[in-house]
Amino acid sequence: MKKELVTAGFALLSLTVPLKASAADFSQFVVFGDSLSDTGNLFNVTQGLPTGPLPPDPPYFQGRFSNDKIWVDYLGDNLGLPPTTITDLIVQLRTTAPEGVNYAFGGSLSGQGNFLNVPGVPGVLEQVGSFTQPFLTNNQKVDPNGLYAVWGGANDYLFTQNPDVTQTVKNVSDSVGLLAQAGAKNILVFNLPDLGKTPLVSATGNTNAFTTLTNNHNAALAAALGQLSNTPGVNIIPVDVDSLFNRVLANPSEFGFTNVTAPCVVGDLVQGVLTSVCNNPNDFLFFDSVHPSSSAHKLVADTALASIRAKSVPERSTALSLLALGVGAAAMLQRKQKNLALTPVASQVVSKHSSRAVVER
């Protein structure tokens, strides 16, 4: 456990205080997003498609848009909080999951709906709205001790006509704002990697236009998060995926990649027509034309964890003990978060439930 030496001006008093990363003791892990965060929701709801479920397994891994685990899995494993997909909860007729819930769907737009036109697949803001609405309506709060994550916007730029940066960023920031309004305290928010460097865009020759879109999105998102960070008691944790991918693109070998320009999988994912799959996907930055390989996702998870730890705080019990010893200044850190309330997000299947899931530790 990380240690921090705390002194408070007393000549004879110095204490070694345990400073836990916020990651070390959250109650639950709740995720909202698109295919970059989906661990099986779209796969579950597209079982009846003539071309088969999306994404096809193999070569995609168990409903993930990659060759193996994605950042949600890696971070969830690190926290000891692997979230359950909302669609699995619905099938199992469960209303809660002790470690958290993943509401992300492949194809989701930042606001409402999805670019795949799959009925019932919600956008990111829609996911968050469905989750928070029962609490806000009943003047209740979600459990403040969970870790919440929001990542969206890429599909708006890659797969819609006339993408609007202002509206897309508003959708993402409104999602964060709703969570904060409902009582969430720790919220991870991811920016976008340079979409102009994806194999999909590179093949069209529109690299500069999409790089500009990405830069504008990330700048506007940073400004919006800066405003939201002024909300009392809310810990906004930005995750800079853009800088991470730029470092990888500049020095591939440093991160273990041999190919950062071509996709491992070639073909049309939506149509279910895949023409070739490489033998060494984790040597590639991109598994397909837009989605990262599992190795790249591991880097995203590591970056998210580092971002969380950069805002580490001691638990309230530690702060109180320091106050009792007269070390007032050392106790001005926030409490770590523990338990999260879970409410349903899809098809109103479990919308009538608003019970809270509490983890006993």
Residue ranges and their predicted role:
Residues M1-V6, S317:
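Bacterial N-terminal signal peptides that target proteins for export
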Residues E4, A8, A24-F26:
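Membrane-cytosol interface segments of multi-pass membrane proteins
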Residues F10-A11, A21:
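Cleavable N-terminal signal peptides
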Residues A21-P314, R361:
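Conserved active-site regions of diverse hydrolases
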Residues E315-L333:
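A short, hydrophobic C-terminal helix/tail in secreted or cell-surface proteins
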Residues A330-R361:
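C-terminal membrane-anchoring or membrane-association module
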